[in-house]
Amino acid sequence: MMKSEMFRISSEPEATSAEVAVVREGLYRFNFDATGLTRHYDVNLFVRDRAGKIRGGLLGYVWAEWLHITELWLSDECRRQGLGARLLQKAERVASLVGARGAFLNTFDFQAPAFYARHGYEVYATLPDYPPGRAEHHLRKVFEMRGDSWHLHGRG
C-alpha cells in the first residue's frame, strides 16, 4: 500500500470551527517555522451602538511586518458617517505600533476600491472576471519609515 493510500480526502462544507482551526494552525506553524517570524497580532475593531450591538467592524492581523485586513463591513445606518475611515485609521495605527510597515487587503470593484484609494491604498494586482463580469482588486499601502520604526504618512 502506498503511503498516500492511508489517507482520504473529504469535502466538508459544514466543518466545525475547531476542524477549520486545525488546518489554520497547521499552516501558521509551518509559516512560523519556515520564516522564523512567530509574532502574530490580531486586529479586531468593532462599531457598536449604545445597546452594545455590533454594527460593523474591521478584522485582520499583523504578521511579517504587514497588516492584512481581511474584512471591513458597516451596516447601512453606519455608512457615510466617517466610521469606515476611523476604523481604517485605527487599524493602521495599531498595526504601526506593533511594527507593521504597511497594510494590504482585497476588495471587489462593487465594494470600496475608491474608498481605499482615498486613504492611500494602491492596486498592485487585479483578478478579472471574479465574480463573473466583475473584478477583485488587491491593494496595499506602505507606511513611512522614520528612524528605526514605521509610521503612517502624516501622522505621529
Language-model regions: role of each:
Residues 23, 116, 121:
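Conserved active-site tyrosine of GNAT-family acetyltransferases
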Residues 42-46, 57, 71, 136-138:
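Short hydrophobic/aromatic beta-strand element in the GNAT-like acyltransferase core
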Residues 62-70, 79, 131-136:
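A conserved beta-turn-beta hairpin within the catalytic core of GNAT-like acetyltransferases
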Residues 80-93, 118:
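Conserved acetyl-CoA-binding loop-helix of GNAT-fold acetyltransferases
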Residues 95-108:
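Conserved GNAT acetyl-CoA-binding A-motif
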Residues 104-106, 122-140:
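Conserved catalytic-core motifs of GNAT/GCN5-like acyltransferases
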